[in-house]
């Protein structure tokens, strides 16, 4: 019984000491919040439609819902997209795009980071660059010579995005395009 009481006292003391040390950590989020405010125009619920290439000459139409939320007191954005289209053989509605991204600002590098994850199990990191009308980011294939580049332009409540593919970083082919409207 004494050992349990001693263990409980030690555990409680450890929690008090560690909790106090955690609470004393300085808040360094100011520069991050300030930089992330530049992306406030993106926050909202968005719906629309578009097309993507599924192979040579195989253009597929889709509808999409994108949710962009400010999280952790404005330190990050959570971006979640769900795109649905029709199966070419059966005509049944299928999910073709289900992705999640976390956008943050790295004050040491003075750069925005785009960390993404897809339903296919892929993930990656990219620098997100602000442009005059929106933003862009580029993904480089691991172990393969290819690049994907995405551009988003937002004017008022309209989000226009297109993606491009390149094997050499010089010649680009448009592989997807979508236009969304802010619904919330």
Question: Positions of the model-derived regions?
Answer:
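N-terminal secretory signal peptides that target proteins for export/translocation
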Residues: 1-3
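Bacterial N-terminal signal peptides
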Residues: 8-18
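Hydrophobic small-molecule pocket/channel-lining residues, especially in calycin-type beta-barrels
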Residues: 22-184
């Amino acid at each position: 019984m004494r050992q349990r009481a001693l263990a409980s006292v030690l555990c409680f003391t450890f929690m008090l000491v560690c909790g106090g040390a955690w609470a004393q950590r300085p808040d360094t989020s100011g520069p991050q919040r300030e930089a992330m405010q530049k992306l406030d125009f993106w926050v909202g619920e968005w719906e629309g439609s578009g097309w993507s290439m599924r192979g040579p000459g195989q253009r597929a139409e889709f509808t999409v819902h994108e949710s962009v939320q400010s999280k952790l007191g404005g330190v990050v954005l959570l971006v979640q997209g769900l795109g649905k289209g029709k199966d070419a053989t059966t005509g049944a509605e299928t999910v073709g795009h289900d992705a999640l991204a976390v956008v943050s600002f790295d004050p040491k590098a003075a750069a925005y980071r785009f960390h993404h994850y897809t339903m296919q199990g892929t993930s990656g990191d990219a620098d997100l660059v602000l442009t005059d009308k929106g933003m862009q980011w580029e993904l480089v294939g691991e172990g393969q010579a290819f690049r994907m580049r995405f551009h988003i332009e937002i004017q008022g409540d309209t989000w226009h995005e297109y993606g491009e593919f390149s094997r050499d970083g010089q010649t680009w082919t448009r592989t997807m395009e979508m236009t969304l409207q802010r619904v919330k």
